[in-house]
């Protein structure tokens, strides 16, 4: 992180971007913003990654179509309705793009729509027709604009999620900004996770897509809150090029750019996992000693996905057998008998399992460690050099309450 400087501004920090959030009427609570608009001053190189669910939101169909040429200039996002499994969904998403294009004076196929909320609900164009002109009038290239947009895309999130950082390329300052939402239905390949990133680096569309496709599997696809892969998972990245710093694939500058994207993605992955519905603790599982990267990723995600282990973490119970169980049912060519497990927080560390067997520890000390709000699960498979991380949260009574009342 020493080469990457944290700065204010969120998604509006890079040159050439403005954002806004308004209440347009999709959500019944008038105090909640439910429409976000992000605009670039110029046509941008664009990249996207989406849900692997066979059922996917209508906006994703439109995004894929609009990004075929590798360029876009605006993103419009609503919360409160997923626009998924609606008979007029695709046409409504296209009509939304038409309204944005008219208000901003850009091409309709340069607009990328996105939605989050309840699946299978009727949706009309009226809230968009009302809200998009209001959002266009409110566009601001500052921290407030980013914050309003980040707030407008929230559903059961408890707080907005934003980040921006700056780094140097060829003596020029390059910035990356991002906003995200996601609290439940998070088990990506990608959560509903929506994440929008901007940069003022000059990157060709193909190189930008490759960079995003490199970062997503190592970060956002390593989050699990509840094991449900959403229908609307979307990550979009726009590059304005207005910093003047050109980044070409296969160069050290490109590697730096990917590292910066990874820094942003890891930060937001932790934010998303820690804000899981009803969560009281962020869980981070680091696997070392794996025979290959795929195994390292699979094992780390298996651990933080285990319902039994997540419940144990809520109760501050060092039930390491549940960790070993989750490792054991994970595919991969490794010798389980070489596995060790440690549990760590700012309160200390306990070594609970060595060579897949009990390692003497104090239950009282373990309880102190596990009462903290961030817990590290350190797994060494002893079978190679590969490593990976995954992020999740504990499973609480409130998760059931939130999802039992979601549509009421």
Where are these regions (language model features)?
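A structural signal for small-residue-enriched, beta-sheet-centric alpha/beta enzyme cores
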Residues: 2-91, 95, 101-408
